[in-house]
Each structure stands twice: as structure tokens, then as C-alpha cells.
Amino acid sequence: MRIILFGAAGNVGSRIANEALSRGHTVTAVVRKTDQLATLSEGVLGQLGDAGDSALVAKLSEGQDLIISAIRPSEGSEHLLPLLTKSLLAGAAQANKRLLIVGGAASLEIPGEKGQTVLTAPGFLPPSVLDIARACAEQHNICRENTETNWTYISPPPMLTPGIRTGQYRLGSDQLVVDENGQSAISMEDFAVALIDEAEQPKHHQTRFTAAY
């Protein structure tokens, strides 16, 4: 499979690239800055571009089988996430390509909390991450309202950290997947496994799923 990946220089994006490469897929990473090309994993094809340009997204996606977005704006630029998402959705629709979006946990419901989400539950999130959480919730709403693009939104659990690849995970839809201790977590490596599994064997179309241990 030929995959074009936006956000490949990030923590999650780099692991998605590595997982895809390990399975024999071809990965083209789109980055905004020349110096980011040197940070890409060996075997990843580098391409300069901007996810905010929907026409360019469509053009770069020509000859590709799948678009993946793992974009996460830096602190202070969280407001860009919804705008970039709209551009990616438009570009994917124009190119007639499937789009997998790494989103956030903000809109996931907390089991037993009467519909409260990670974002709305009082005190669940520290103030330092509220801006990106709000942006991710808006991002999810933008996807839900889109009927023109073959999109899939993948929400990580609240605890998404570097770790090891076990190949194990459990899937959910709109609620947090929690373990016997009430924790919802997964390593970035296994989150990448879940995403590439979905890329290879599509089961979610114009909907969201989540993966955790």
C-alpha cells in the first residue's frame, strides 16, 4: 500500500510510519520545513507540503492509496487543528482517497459518568491540555458533519505514551476503553498497530473508533 502521511515528524506520526514500513508499505511523509526531512525514519520518502492547502493535499495524494493525518499543532497553535482538518477532508474528497485521522480523546465518553466526556467531566483534564482538548473535540465534530469524504477518526485513550509494541489492544467506539483498574491507556507503538490494522482491513467508515489495553 502507498501511504501519504501528514504529521510524520511527531511522536505518533513517526511510529505510524515505522509500523507501516515494517509491514512493507511505502510511506511518503509530508512536512512543512526542510529541516524536518532529516528527522524522518530511514525508508520514509520525504515531501515538503502544507496540510492547510487542500488543493496541494489532493495533488500530493495522486498515486497514493491512503492518506493518514497525525497532525498535532504546537502549544499556542491549537486553533489550527480544525482548519487543517477541514483542508485534509477537502483534499481527500477531491482526490477520492480514504483519510485516517489521528484525533484526540476529548470527545470520548467516560463509562458510568452519565454521558460526560473526557473534556466535559469536571477535573478530568489538567488546565494545561484544555486548549488542545477543545480543538480535538471540534475536530471530531467537523468529521462527523462531513459526508463527502471516506474518513475514519481514531481517538487514542487519555494516556498515550511512548512504550513497547506488543501488538495487543482492544477496540471501542464512543466510550473510553478501560482496564480492570479503570485506566485507559496504550503505548504509541500499539496505537500505531491498531491504526495500520484498520488501514489494511477497513472496518470503520465515516465513524470513530478508539483503541486501548
Predicted feature locations:
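N-terminal Rossmann NAD(P)H-binding glycine-rich loop of SDR-like oxidoreductase domains
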Residues: I3-R23
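Mid/C-terminal beta-alpha module of Rossmann-like enzyme folds, strongest
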Residues: R2-A9, K97-L99, D174-Y213
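Conserved glycine-rich Rossmann-like NAD(P)H-binding loop of the short-chain dehydrogenase/reductase
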Residues: T26-R32
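Glycine/proline-rich active-site loop of Rossmann-fold NAD(P)-dependent oxidoreductases
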Residues: N146-T147, T161-Q168, E198-T207
